[in-house]
Amino acid sequence: TARKVEALIRRMPRGTFEFTDYIEDDVVTDIPIRLKVAMTVGDGHIHLDYTGSDVQVGSALNVPTGGRAHPFMAIALFNYFITKDPGIPLNAGVLRPIRMTLPVGSVVNPQFPAACGVRYATVLRIYDAVLGALARALPAEIPAASAGQGCMVALALPDLEATDDDLWLQRTPPTRGLDNPFARARHALSQIAVTARGFLA
């Protein structure tokens, strides 16, 4: 897998391509959250540098990466690779040629006790930022970043047959949704069991 990804990267133009995107606010304040990425394409590897992204925030929008290369920070690259070569297996090898700089104390590498329960809303905007950098590197293939989806669609339902206070939270992933007539609901939704005491799974 890594060799296939490296071969695709070698076909990309060399250089550093930057893009900055924003989340409108962090819910606690009305100050936008900046997400900045510099994508450097080298010989068979890509470096994503998130230096310049804002410091961790007081709301649950922080993305806990532990400072290591994390799949959440490169989803746009994964989608590009599997679009160019649909035969690439989706495993850890896809991430191996990708290096990352994730500044300590930033929204992309927060420190304890940072809240992070709504991190996927930030991940969606990170996707847009990396897509924007790709658009600058490959304007003939990637026309632009998306219009920006910074929210998750969730539906909470009580379990009427449960004997306790269990609740089912259904989250629609960004790759597929309920508007797809060919997708069955069980594929279109992720189920996460939660209770009033916190997340179970």
Label for each model-derived stretch:
Residues T1-A201:
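Glycine/proline-enriched, intrinsically flexible loops and inter-domain linkers
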